[in-house]
Amino acid sequence: MAVSFSLVGAFKGLSLASSSSFLKGDFGAAFPVAPKFSVSFPLKSPLTIESAHKKGAGSTKNGRDSPGQRLGVKIFGDQVAKPGSIIVRQRGTKFHPGKNVGLGKDHTIFSLIDGLVKFEKFGPDRKKISVYPREVQPENPNSYRNRKRESFRLQRERRKARREGVILQSSVDTCFCCC
């Protein structure tokens, strides 16, 4: 009798109707089940895809850009500048004019003489550009460059003489002490 009461107690809330909670999967009332744990996430916002191109109202006005102004230093320090050559193109006076240079109406600094460009400090926070006349220093006759140039000159002379049929004797080949 105790078994029948326990079975009746177990099936007490069940019915076989189509609207019963048993057929829908609700076992909580009939069978004691461990409590369900659920984790809730925040609602997802709609996915927005951004691209490199701006689209929208007035998109025909997008995609325009002006060409660069070609500003900056044109002749660097210790390089040769001819008269009238542009040294720096700038907006404003980032560089101030020094000796032998002029300042154009668009703040372009240009050379007035033929010489070397020098960038100098002008106060604590300014820079000055000057052009100094180039002093030509005499070349060392024993330098590598001069010896190489002389060697190639002798080779050209020998080659030219061979073509003409005359063989030149170099100054090293003739000896006046033994003969």
UniProtKB/Swiss-Prot annotation:
Tagged with keyword Oxidoreductase: no
MF annotations from Gene Ontology: structural constituent of ribosome
Domain of life of the native organism: Eukaryota
Pfam families: Ribosomal_L27
GO cellular component entries: chloroplast; ribonucleoprotein complex; ribosome
Localisation per UniProt entry: Plastid, Chloroplast
Transit peptide, start-end: 1-51
Keyword terms, alphabetized: Chloroplast, Plastid, Ribonucleoprotein, Ribosomal protein, Transit peptide
GO BP annotations listed: translation
Stretch forming the signal peptide: none
Keyword ATP-binding: no
InterPro entries the UniProt entry points to: Ribosomal_bL27, Ribosomal_bL27_CS
Transmembrane segments annotated in the record for this chain: none
Subunit record text: Part of the 50S ribosomal subunit.
Family to which the UniProt record says this protein belongs: Belongs to the bacterial ribosomal protein bL27 family.
PANTHER family per UniProt: LARGE RIBOSOMAL SUBUNIT PROTEIN BL27M, RIBOSOMAL PROTEIN L27
Record protein name field: Large ribosomal subunit protein bL27c
Species per Swiss-Prot/TrEMBL record: Nicotiana tabacum
